[in-house]
Amino acid sequence: MRVLVVEDEPRTAEYLQKGLSESGFVVDIANNGGDGLHMAEETDYDVIILDVMLPGMDGWTVIKSIRSKSETPVLFLTALDDVADRVRGFELGADDYLVKPFAFAELLARIRRCLRQSTSKESERLRIADLDIDVLGRRVFRGTTRIELTNQEFSLLHLLMRRRGEVLSRTTIASQVWGVNFDTDTNVVDVAIRRLRSKVDDPFDQKLIHTVRGMGYVLDPERGR
């Protein structure tokens, strides 16, 4: 799961990045409204945590632009605690509103609630051939066989399944799963794919994850390796 945090206070941003990363999320940080909006438009986030009082472009303006194009869950995290501000946030399309100072455990619970609501609009499960992924329960099956994955392996498989049939470059995978752009000479993505295949593909007759030479990887039951 990938989270965008739009927060201009460095210590708060660092605290959120550390806590969310330790909770299994890939976290991107924007320290002003303009950068936050640009990142929200360029990347497919699972949830956005948005401050209101931001330099350049405030959070009210950011969410207006986001809602004109996307239904990505947005949680306001702000020091503005007036009822009028909360009402304004919800009227502009926020999924939740939490006032600073806050307890991280409550923030995490609210994020998970936003994710549950978002996935219920689509599907809490993804299924391709006999590969089944329970997004909220973070469980994976091929047929009746349960497959144990690490957090990174789950994020990688979730990405491939959401973008079924689309060839994803190593750069795209690295950015979406690890939140960084690896040097093209490194084989971090290749190693991760190989480990994922060893669990999801190798023990089974039908292979789902395929290499497209010179381009990247794709999850597609119709292709042959």
UniProtKB/Swiss-Prot annotation:
A GO biological process held by the record: regulation of DNA-templated transcription
Positions of modified residues (4-aspartylphosphate): 51
Pfam families: Response_reg, Trans_reg_C
DNA-binding region boundaries: 123-221
GO terms for cellular component: cytosol; protein-DNA complex
Induction: By cadmium, lead, and zinc.
CDD domains documented for this protein: REC_OmpR_CusR-like (cd19935), trans_reg_C (cd00383)
Protein modification: Phosphorylated by CzcS.
Gene Ontology molecular function terms on file: phosphorelay response regulator activity; transcription cis-regulatory region binding
Compartments, as annotated in UniProt: Cytoplasm
Keywords: Activator, Cadmium, Cobalt, Cytoplasm, DNA-binding, Phosphoprotein, Plasmid, Transcription, Transcription regulation, Two-component regulatory system, Zinc
InterPro entries, sorted: CheY-like_superfamily (IPR011006), CusR-like (IPR006291), OmpR/PhoB-type_DNA-bd (IPR001867), Sig_transdc_resp-reg_receiver (IPR001789), WalR-like (IPR039420), WH-like_DNA-bd_sf (IPR036388)
Residue ranges of every copy of the Response regulatory domain listed in the record: 2-115
Role noted for this protein: Member of the two-component regulatory system CzcS/CzcR involved in the control of cobalt, zinc and cadmium homeostasis.
PANTHER family reported in the protein's UniProt record: REGULATOR OF RPOS, TWO-COMPONENT RESPONSE REGULATOR
Stated name of the protein: Transcriptional activator protein CzcR
Species the sequence originates in: Cupriavidus metallidurans (strain ATCC 43123 / DSM 2839 / NBRC 102507 / CH34)
